[in-house]
Amino acid sequence: MAERRLLLNPLVHNFNYYVRHLSSPGYLLCEVPDAVKQELQNSIDNLEKTPETDARGSLRGHLEEEWHLPITPNMSTFCEHLSGVYLEKFGLQPSMGLAETMRDMTLVEFNLERLWINYQKKYDFNPLHIHSGVFSFVIWVQIPYELEEERKRYKSNGDETAAFMFQYLNSIGGIDTEYLYLDKSFEWKMAFFPARLN
C-alpha cells in the first residue's frame, strides 16, 4: 500500500487560528451546608399541610403533594451567596433575560422569594418547565432508591428514567441534555441554575 503524504504549501498552510468554544449557561452543584439543612429539615418536619400552604396551583408539576415552605435566614443568605458565585463563574448570560436591563451586577440584590417542597411519588412527574425570577434551584432531600435498582426495574436503551435533566439549545440550534443520575448520594445536594434553564 502506498504511503499518502500531505504536502503543505507554506503560502496556504502557514497561518494563525484561535479556538473559541460556544456554550450555554451552566449550573452549580453543591452540598447544602449544615445550618441550611437544619433549617430546611425543621421547616419540613413542622409543615402544616393546609389549603394556604398547598403550592400545586402555582407550579407545573404533576404531583399530588407540593407545599410552600417558609423562607429561613440561612437559606436566604445561602441563595444570595450562590447568586454571586454563579455570576463570578459564568458571568451574566444574555439568555438569562437580564443583560438588557442590568448592566452593573454589583448594584443588584438577589432575594429568595419562593420556596416549596415536592413529595414525588409513583406516577408523579415534573414536565419540562422554566421558573420565574433569575435563578432557581433543586435540593434533593430524600431519594428512596439506589440508581442500580431503578436501572434494573426500567430496562431501556438509556438512563433517563432515573435521571434529573436539563435540556437546552446549543449554539447551532440542536437540543443538548445534561443528565444528573440520582441516587442516595445526592441527598442534600443542590443544583443552582438560571431560572430559564429547563
Named regions from a protein language model:
Residues 113-192:
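Catalytic core of non-heme Fe(II) oxygenases with the double-stranded beta-helix
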